[in-house]
Amino acid sequence: MNKILVSWYFALFFCVFTALGQDSGSVESLLKLAQDNTAFFDTDFSGRYTVVQEKPGEGKNLTEAIMYRRDKTSQWTILVTGPSREKGKGYLQTDGTIWFYDPSDRRFTFTSARDKFQNTNANNSDFAPQFYYRDYQIESAQDVKLGALDCVLFTLNAKIDRVDYPKLKLWVTKKDGLIRKKEDYSLSGQLLRTTAIPSYQIVENNERKYSVPVSMLIVDNLRGKRIGEKMQYERTQISISNVSFSKVDNVVYTKSYLEMMGDL
C-alpha cells in the first residue's frame, strides 16, 4: 500500500512539473523570465496609452494618457491627456503609495493598486511590473497550444495576501517568456478577469531589446449585461505607442509635476 502511495505522489509531482519534458527548475525559470519581461529595472520607460472601455449597450469611452515608469525605485506617473474633461488628472506611485490628482480641486487622494484606472476594467497595478515568480507558487504547469503559439500554462496560487488576485492562470510562450493570456480567479475559483496580449513590439535601447505589448484586452467576467440571448461583458483595450527608454527627469515622479501639468 505504501509503495502505491509513493508511486502516486511521484506521478502527481511528475505531471505538475514535467508535463513539458522539463524539470521543476526550468519551469520556474520560465515563470521568472515572464516576470522579468514585465519590468524595466535598468532604465526609465515612457509611452502613450490609449484606453478604450466598452460597456455592453452603452458604447465606448476613450482615455488617453502618457505613462512614465522608473521600476528600479518603484515609481510611476500617469498623466491623463484626453478627453478634455479628464485632461490634467494624474496618478503617482512613490514611496509605496499611489496618489490620484484631480486638477479641478487641486487635491491628491489616496488610491490603491487594486482600484480601477479611470473607472475602466484595468487595475492601477496593470500598468506596473508583475511579480508572478516572487508572489505566487506554481500549482501546475503544462504544455499547451494557444492558437499557433507553443505555451506553458501555469496555474498559480498566491504566497502572500498583498496581491490583487489569489489565483492566476498564465499562458507563457516557451520561446521568449512573454505572457499571452492571463485569467484572474477568486479564492473560491471564480473567474474574475481575462487578459489577452496577442502581440508585442520590440524596442531597442543601448543595444538592448525590450518587449512591450502592442495592446492588451481586459475582459471583466463579473460586469456585463445580457443582450438578446448572449451575455456580453465589459472590456477595456489598452494600446501602447511612442515607447521610449530614455531617461526621464526626476521631477516627473513628484506631486509638483502633476500640479504643474494640471494647470496647463
What are the functions of these language-model segments?
Residues 50-56, 81-83, 101-103, 157-159, ...:
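A generic structural motif
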Residues 1-5:
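Positively charged n-region of N-terminal signal peptides that target proteins for export
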Residues 149-252:
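Gly/Pro-enriched, hydrophobic low-complexity segments
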Residues 22-36, 40-43, 50, 94-166, ...:
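Flexible, processing/modification-adjacent segments and terminal tails
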Residues 7-17:
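Bacterial N-terminal signal peptides
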Residues 45-77, 81-83:
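N-terminal, post-signal-peptide region of Sec/Tat-exported proteins
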Residues 67-68, 138-145, 198-204:
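Short amphipathic beta-strand and strand-loop transition segments with alternating hydrophobic
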